[in-house]
Design a protein with these regions (language model features):
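Acidic, metal-coordinating catalytic segment for phosphate/diphosphate chemistry
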Residues: 1-7
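Short connector loops at helix/strand junctions that flank enzyme active sites
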Residues: 3, 29, 68-72
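Conserved Nudix-box catalytic region and its N-terminal flanking loop in Nudix hydrolases
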Residues: 6, 12-47
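Short, well-ordered beta-strand micro-motif
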Residues: 9-10, 74-78, 88
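Hydrophobic residues at beta-strand termini and immediately following loops
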Residues: 19, 52, 87
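Nudix hydrolase/Nudix homology domain
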Residues: 24-25, 81-116
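Functional cleft and adjacent loop/helix regions within the main domain
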Residues: 25-30, 59-63, 76, 115-116
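Active-site segment of metal-dependent pyrophosphate-handling enzymes
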Residues: 41, 45-81
């Protein structure tokens, strides 16, 4: 069974918005279950949302202690007024917990922007 999630990429220059997740005890990219661009537009109160790419990959689920198949959709939200904590990808990867649990997502994003 695929686990579908949308990842929102909100940039200021070379930094990306992340939020601290109390459950995971680490910073994460804004995300939501499912793949509905209209929900993303409503959440951020903007029509400036664009689909970038998608990735299907297997990943170990720490919370369920087993391998799962994930289908991630990546969207860019263009709105410089969104407040929060912004990091470079390198800054995020300096955190061992982020590196262990989210390096795949960060590498997908890095790969996308390096090809642009």
């Amino acid at each position: 069974m695929e686990h579908v999630h949308s990842i929102m990429i909100i940039k200021k220059e070379n930094k990306y918005l992340n939020y601290y997740d109390d459950r995971w005890k680490m910073y994460l990219f804004p995300n939501m279950k499912g793949n509905n661009i209209e929900e993303i537009k409503a959440k951020y109160k903007t029509d400036n949302v664009k689909f970038l790419f998608e990735k299907v990959h297997e990943k170990f689920s720490v919370s369920n202690n087993k391998m799962k198949l994930y289908h991630h959709y990546f969207y860019e939200v263009e709105d410089s007024d969104i407040e929060g904590k912004y990091f470079t990808l390198e800054e995020l990867l300096k955190d061992p917990k982020v590196k262990e649990n989210n390096e795949d997502i960060i590498s997908f994003i890095k790969e996308y922007y390096e090809k642009k």
